C-alpha cells in the first residue's frame, strides 16, 4: 500500500505541472490534485506527532484550509458545488466531476484515522479519470461514468465491508472511542484531530460541558445509559447475551459519551463508534448516522445525496448485497453480540432550507425503485444477522449553541425534561390508556387554520382484562417521557393530516398536508416551493423515501407538556428534534410500526397487560413475504397542542370520550398535564 500511495502522490505533483489536459478541465484536475497533496501534508503532521503539538490557532488554520471548498463562504465558487462545476465544466461532465471531488474529499477523515488505503483508492480514481482526459480532449460522459461505476463496484468489498465491521466490532470501530477515553477533554485541541469540521457548535458544546460539574455530567450520562438498559428489561430481551453497544453522537459531546461508555462497561458492553459516511458506497440519503459534525455546510451534503445515481443499477445492487452477506457471514459470531444503537441527537441548529439544484445528480424513476428494493433487502439481511427481536436502542437529545443566546438556560431545561419523574407520567398515561382501550376508533381534529381531520381505527381487544391497545411509554428507549402509542388498524383509517410548520430529519415543511385512505397515503403537498411539482418531489424523497405510498405505522398522544411549555418560553418549538417534539402533541408516523422486526415478541405495560397492537395488515405479510412487510423508514409528524382541536375516542356503541379539547387534557386524573400549559 505504501508503494501505491507514493506513486499516487508523485502523480499528483506531476498533474499540477502538466498541460496535457485541455482547459477548463486542467484547472479542475490541478485543484483536486492540490487537495490530495494537502492530505499528504496532513498525513505527515499526524504520523510525526506534529499535529498534537500545534496550537489551537494553527489547528484552526489547517482545518479551514482543508475544508475551504465545503464552507459556505467559498461554496458558490467551489468544484464541490455541482452548480459551479456545471457552470465551469459544462453539463453532465460538471455534475460528474463534482461528485468525484466530493468522493475524494472524504480523505480528510481517512487520514486522521490513518486509513490510507481509502486515500489511495480515491487518488487512483482521479488518476484514471485524468488519463481519460489526456487521451481524449473531451471524453464521453458514459465512458467516465463507467470508471466511477467500477470504482464503486470493485471497492464495495472495502468500504461497505468495513462499514459493517466498524458497527459490530469494538476492535474495529475504536478510533473515536480511543480519542474519547485517552485524550484530555479539557484541552479542546483534541476536537481538531477527530476528522470532522469543527465549528462554533462543536467547540462551544465541548467548552460548555467542560464547565459543568461531574455530578451533572453523570446525571445526563446515567439517564442515557439507563434508558438503554431499561429498554431491554421492558421488552423482555436478554442484555446479558450482548457485548457491543453502537454509539451515535455529534462531535462536542465527548464528556457525556465518556461517562456513558463507563456505564455501559458495567453492563458488560464495549462501545463501537463509526463516523458518518463520506463515500457514495455507504452514504445514506436522508440523515447522518454515527459520529458526525454539526456545523458543516448542509447544502453541500444535500447537493450530493443522490450521487449514488452515477452507479445505481441492478448489478450494483446485487454486488453490494453480496458484500454485505459475505461480511456478516464471516463475522457472525461478533454480530451475535451486537446489542443495538445508543443515540445522542441534537437540536437548535439554524433552519436549513435546501435549494434543489438541477445540476446535482438525480436518481431516475427506475433507480428510485432499485434503491427502495435495495434498502428493503438490506434491512432484511441485517435483521438476519442482527435480529430485531434480540436488540434494542435508546435515543436522547440535547441543544447546541446555535440555538441562541439562552443556550445555557435551554440546556438546563432540557436536562430537566430528560429526567422528569416517569412514575408520575406512567400513572397519568395509564388513565388515558384505560379510556382509549374502550374505543373502536379515535377522531383527531385541528383548530383554526389546521385542516387535520382523521379517523384512526383501533385494534379490538379479545380480553380487556389482560390486553391493551396502547403502550405506556416512559423514559427508556425514547427519552424524554411522555406518550402513549399504538399501531392503528389500517382498514378504515382515513382523513387528512395537516401541520403548519414541522421539521423532519432536519428539513422544514410548511403547510404539510397528507391524505390517507385505508391507512395509506394517497395525496400530499406542502408550500416550501413555488412549484407544486417540487413540493411533491420534496415529500416523496424525504418523507416517503421514494415509496409510492406508506401506511400509518403509529398513532400516539404526546403528554410532555413541560417540554411544550419550554418550547413556548424560549420560542424553540421549530428547533426541537422529533424525539422531543413527538411528546408535545398527538403524532402520526408514516412507515413501519414501532415493533418492526420484533412483532412476535410479547411486550407488556407496567400494569401487566400485553400490548397486542403490534401488527397491521402490511407488517403481517412478513410471514409470507418480508419484502412486502417493511419500508425501512418511520417518520413522526406532530400536531402541536395549539393547533389541536380535539382528540375523541369513540366506542362501538357510539359513546364519545374526549381526551383533549382545545389543547387541554380533560380526563379526570390527567389535568396535571395542563399545569405547564397554563
Please place each PLM-identified region on the residue numbering:
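Active-site bordering "gate/hinge" segments
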Residues: 1-491, 660-678
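Short solvent-exposed loop/turn micro-motifs enriched in small/polar/acidic residues
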Residues: 437, 505-508, 548, 581
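Short acidic, glycine-rich loop/turn motifs
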Residues: 444-450, 501-504, 649-653
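Conserved AWS/pre-SET-to-SET junction and N-terminal core of the SET lysine methyltransferase domain
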Residues: 475-513
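Active-site and channel-lining beta-strand-loop segments
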Residues: 509-526
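Dual-mode signal for accessory low-complexity, basic/Gly-rich regions
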Residues: 523-595, 599
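Glycine-anchored, exposed beta-strand/edge motif detector
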Residues: 584, 590, 599-604, 615-623
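Extended hydrophobic packing segments that form well-structured cores
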Residues: 607-678
Amino acid at each position: 500500500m505504501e508503494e501505491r500511495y507514493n506513486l499516487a502522490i508523485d502523480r499528483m505533483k506531476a498533474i499540477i505541472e502538466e498541460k496535457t489536459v485541455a482547459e477548463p478541465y486542467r484547472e479542475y484536475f490541478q485543484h483536486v490534485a492540490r487537495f490530495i497533496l494537502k492530505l499528504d501534508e496532513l498525513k505527515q503532521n499526524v504520523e510525526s506527532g506534529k499535529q498534537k503539538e500545534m496550537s489551537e490557532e494553527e489547528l484552526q488554520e489547517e482545518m479551514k484550509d482543508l475544508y475551504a471548498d465545503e464552507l459556505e463562504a467559498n461554496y458558490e465558487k467551489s468544484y464541490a458545488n455541482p452548480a459551479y462545476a456545471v457552470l465551469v465544466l459544462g453539463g453532465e461532465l460538471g455534475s460528474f466531476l463534482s461528485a468525484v471531488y466530493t468522493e475524494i474529499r472524504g480523505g480528510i477523515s481517512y487520514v486522521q484515522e490513518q486509513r490510507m488505503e481509502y486515500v489511495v483508492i480515491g487518488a487512483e480514481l482521479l488518476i484514471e479519470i485524468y488519463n481519460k482526459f489526456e487521451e481524449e480532449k473531451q471524453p464521453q460522459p458514459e465512458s467516465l461514468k463507467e470508471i466511477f461505476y467500477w470504482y464503486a463496484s470493485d471497492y464495495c468489498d472495502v468500504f461497505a465491508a468495513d462499514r459493517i465491521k466498524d458497527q459490530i466490532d469494538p476492535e474495529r470501530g475504536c478510533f473515536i472511542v480511543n480519542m474519547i477515553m485517552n485524550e484530555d477533554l479539557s484541552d479542546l485541541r483534541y476536537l481538531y484531530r477527530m476528522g470532522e469540521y469543527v465549528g462554533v457548535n462543536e467547540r462551544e458544546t465541548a467548552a460548555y460541558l467542560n464547565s459543568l460539574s461531574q455530578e451533572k455530567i453523570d446525571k445526563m450520562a446515567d439517564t442515557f445509559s439507563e434508558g438503554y438498559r431499561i429498554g431491554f428489561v421492558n421488552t423482555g430481551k436478554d442484555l446479558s447475551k450482548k457485548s457491543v453497544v453502537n454509539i451515535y453522537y455529534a462531535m462536542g459531546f465527548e464528556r457525556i459519551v465518556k461517562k456513558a461508555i463507563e456505564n455501559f462497561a458495567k453492563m458488560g458492553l464495549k462501545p463501537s463508534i463509526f463516523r458518518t459516511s463520506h463515500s457514495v458506497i455507504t452514504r445514506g440519503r436522508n440523515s447522518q448516522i454515527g459520529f458526525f459534525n454539526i456545523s458543516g455546510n448542509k447544502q453541500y451534503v444535500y447537493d450530493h445525496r443522490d450521487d449514488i445515481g452515477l452507479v445505481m443499477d441492478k448489478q450494483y445492487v446485487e454486488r453490494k448485497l453480496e458484500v454485505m452477506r459475505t461480511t456478516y457471514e464471516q463475522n457472525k459470531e461478533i454480530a451475535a453480540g451486537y446489542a443495538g444503537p445508543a443515540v445522542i441527537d441534537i437540536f437548535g441548529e439554524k433552519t436549513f432550507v435546501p435549494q434543489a439544484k438541477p445540476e446535482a445528480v438525480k436518481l431516475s424513476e427506475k433507480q428510485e425503485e432499485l434503491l427502495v428494493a435495495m434498502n428493503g433487502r438490506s434491512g432484511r439481511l441485517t435483521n438476519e444477522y442482527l435480529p430485531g427481536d434480540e436488540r434494542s436502542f435508546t435515543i436522547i437529545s440535547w441543544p447546541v449553541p446555535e440555538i441562541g443566546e439562552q443556550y445555557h438556560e435551554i440546556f438546563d431545561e432540557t436536562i430537566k425534561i430528560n429526567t422528569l419523574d416517569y412514575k408520575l407520567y406512567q400513572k397519568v398515561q395509564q388513565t388515558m390508556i384505560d379510556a382509549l382501550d374502550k374505543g373502536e376508533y379515535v377522531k383527531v381534529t385541528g383548530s383554526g387554520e389546521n385542516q387535520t381531520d382523521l379517523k384512526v381505527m383501533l385494534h379490538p381487544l379479545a380480553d380487556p382484562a389482560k390486553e391493551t391497545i396502547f403502550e405506556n411509554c416512559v423514559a427508556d428507549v425514547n427519552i424524554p417521557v411522555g406518550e402513549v402509542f399504538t399501531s392503528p388498524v389500517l382498514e378504515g383509517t382515513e382523513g387528512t393530516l395537516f401541520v403548519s410548520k414541522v421539521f423532519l430529519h432536519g428539513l422544514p415543511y410548511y403547510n404539510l398536508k397528507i391524505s390517507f385512505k385505508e391507512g395509506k397515503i394517497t395525496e400530499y403537498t406542502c408550500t416550501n416551493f413555488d412549484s407544486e411539482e417540487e413540493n411533491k418531489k420534496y415529500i416523496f424523497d424525504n418523507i416517503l423515501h421514494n415509496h409510492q405510498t406508506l401506511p400509518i405505522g403509529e398513532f400516539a398522544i404526546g403528554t410532555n407538556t413541560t417540554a411544550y411549555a419550554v418550547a413556548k418560553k424560549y420560542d424553540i418549538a421549530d428547533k426541537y428534534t422529533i424525539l422531543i417534539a413527538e411528546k408535545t402533541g398527538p403524532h402520526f408516523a408514516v412507515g413501519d410500526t414501532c415493533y418492526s422486526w420484533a412483532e412476535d415478541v410479547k411486550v407488556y405495560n407496567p400494569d401487566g397487560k400485553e400490548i397486542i397492537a403490534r401488527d397491521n395488515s402490511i407488517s403481517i405479510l412478513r410471514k409470507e413475504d418480508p419484502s412486502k412487510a417493511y419500508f425501512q423508514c418511520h417518520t413522526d409528524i406532530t400536531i402541536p397542542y395549539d393547533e389541536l382541536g380535539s382528540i375523541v375516542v369513540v366506542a362501538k356503541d357510539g359513546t364519545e370520550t374526549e381526551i383533549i379539547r382545545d389543547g387541554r387534557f380533560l380526563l379526570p386524573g390527567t389535568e396535571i398535564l395542563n399545569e405547564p400549559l397554563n
